[in-house]
């Protein structure tokens, strides 16, 4: 399984963005991509439960799957950022905050239609840099 997998899920639980893209990932098996998505989607239930009990936007640890830790950030518009990583760094909040700033810039673009998949090479590059900066990759 990949060391790091990051997704942005829309308020309607549709996948808006993923890093790395399926085509860029190297898998040990064909089912690995599906397993990554399954783990992330099952974590959405945990996120919804935690969101009901607390007004927090950042959830440091929502689930553990094998050696992977899942963290989440939920915007006020109910957009969910979910990170699955083997890294044990404590600064995932900084990563989510930086990605949130990028997300806000994207949705403020008049050519972007809300709740549609995000196709941005600039975002891919910046997320790759952020993952290295926060030692998550």
PLM region descriptions:
Residues 1-5, 11-137:
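Acidic, low-complexity cytosolic segments
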